Amino acid sequence: MSNMVKYITKQSPTLTLKESQEWCGGYVQMIKLKNGRKILVDEDAKIKTPRPPINEDASEIVNKSGTYVWMIDILGKAIVLEKGVRKGGW
């Protein structure tokens, strides 16, 4: 398992917006995947200097889901929310 992706399940402790932002490294953007999962990524990763590394695992999750997104590669850390999970009430 990659240290660049955090997985949140129904059994995971509550995840707040602040915790999500701290993990991802800034403001987060939620991408809803076709398979029902959601992924949180750093909204401003592409304009940061230095640029965060490509997150191969998160990019693969998005690409395999069949979801079209405006970004080719996910940069930096990401959080994957299992289908039906919305943590922290935000």
Located regions from the model:
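Detector for the mature cores of small, proteolytically processed
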Residues: M1-W90
